[in-house]
Structures are given as structure tokens and as C-alpha cells.
Amino acid sequence: MKKKLWIASLFSLCLFVACGGDDNKIPTGTGGGEEDGGGTDKPAAVEKPRYVWIDAAGNFERYANSIDNIKEDLKRVKETGFTDIVVDVRPTTGDILFKSSVGEPLKRIDIWSNEGYKWMERTATWDYLQTFLNEGRKLGLKVNASINTFVGGYLCPYGLGYEGMLYRDASKKKWATVINATGGQVNTMDLQNCEADWGVKFLNPANNEVQEYLLSLLSDLAKYKPDGIILDRCRYDDYGLMSDFSPESRTEFELFIGESVENFPDDIMKPGTDIPGKWYKRWNAFRAKTIHDF
């Protein structure tokens, strides 16, 4: 009996909340008559999208080599009432799960499984993103693609190893973030202690070559015509305001302010500290504009 009364009370409360407060709303029409377009009918409510994010690493063991698993799970996603999926097609290693003239296909990624922390390899050759597009749209799902943007490699913890463009191609070291450390400027590719330095190796957003490379990747991704493209990690790296203090960033900043920085980096921020210099505010504006303009 108490349960029935509680349900009835909850229903009454919901009804009160849903119907109350209309008297205080500002009318949107110019009058109440039929001739001037007035009326009391409310527009039909638009259904809000419901998203499922399909992380590459988190689902790699199940999806990397199995179209059947993708079909099975997308059917469940649809039956549960979701409207959209977001497919991660460029995880933190920087390698990709779609076809591109400039990107390297993702062949392995570090995962946690029942067997522990290990590498999971992809041996399949079918198009990962296109499979999600095909199978998702058959079910009436919208399919969005997501990339980790300013990333170029990943250093694994526990001595598992590393993966990514920055590790394969030594010439790309100049693309990596340079931090304003206590002892001076340090390229993050020189920080390789798997206990202290593990994680994503970011690219420098102010490097023009980096931007051109990523725009080429995005151009290839757009050819798939996904319902949306999401730019994850479209930012400076996890060292925060310590990055990026590379020669390329200095050049671009001086172009931004229209003059030379006499004492770099001290005039922006003293090495290894958060003590601001004379150009600190303009430096932050430059960083924000770099991401915005990209």
C-alpha cells in the first residue's frame, strides 16, 4: 500500500512540475487571434540525441578483428535507445583506424585484459571506420568519428614499450612538445622514464608542419562523410603552461606580438616555475588563438 501511495505521489509531483510555471512565461506571439497567427498549440518536442562513445583502446580486443562483434553490439546500442555513436579512430598513439594518404594504420595498442596489461594486435585488413558507418546506418544510428588531435605517440607504463609516429620517425622529434623545465627547455621525447614520464606524447600545436599534417588527416577523414567529426585532445599537452617553448613557438609568438622577445623564456615565464613575465598574458592569448584558429 505504501508503495502505491509513493508512486501516486511521485506522479502528482511530476505532473505539477511539468505543468506549473507557464503563467510566468513571456508570450512569443503578437496576439491571441487566429488572424495574426496566434494559438495555443506547442511545437512538437525534439528528441535529444543519446550518444555512446566507442573508445579504441577500451574496445580493441572485441572489435579490432571482428565485424560480427561490431554488428552485435551496435544492435544492442540501437535497441537500448541510443541515437548516435562516436567511433574513436585515432587513439593516443596517433595511428589511425581509417584510410589516409598520410597516416599510419593502427596495428597494435596497449590494453588491460583478463590476461593483464599487454599489447593487442590488429591483423584484420577491412576498413574499421567504414564498417561502423555501414552497420550503424543500417540500424538508423548516426555515426560520428573522433580523433585524438595533437598526439604523436604513447609511452606505456610498466615497461611494456611505446608506439606511434614520434617513436618510429626520428625526424619528427621537432614536432614534439618542448617544456619549460627547471633546467631549461626539454623536448618531451627526451623524457622516457616509463615510471615517471609514461603517457601521451603531444605534438606542438604552434608548429606549422604539425598543423598541415593533421589537416591532411582530417581531409581524408571527412571523405568518409561521417555525421560529425570530434576533435579530442585538441589542446596543449598535460604539462599545462610549461608548454610549448620550442623555437617554432617562439617564432610564431614573436610574429603574433610584432616584436622580438628579449629574454626567452623568462619574459614569458621563468623556467620550472609559474612566475609570470612581461609577456605572460599575451603568451596565453597566443596559445588560445593557436588552438582556436586551427
Show the residue positions of the predicted features:
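Positively charged n-region of N-terminal signal peptides that target proteins for export
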Residues: 1-5, 20-21
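Bacterial Sec-dependent N-terminal signal peptides
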Residues: 9-46
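Active-site-adjacent "subsite" loops/lids of carbohydrate-active enzymes
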Residues: 44-67, 145, 150-224, 276
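Hydrophobic faces of well-ordered beta-strands that scaffold small-molecule active sites
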Residues: 50-54, 85-87, 143-145, 229-232
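Aromatic- and glycine-enriched glycan-recognition loops and surfaces
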Residues: 62-80, 111-138, 211-212, 289-293
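Catalytic domains of carbohydrate-active enzymes, especially glycoside hydrolases
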Residues: 68-95, 224-228
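Aromatic-lined carbohydrate-binding/catalytic grooves of carbohydrate-active enzymes
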Residues: 82-124
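Polysaccharide-binding and catalytic clefts of secreted carbohydrate-active enzymes
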Residues: 177-294
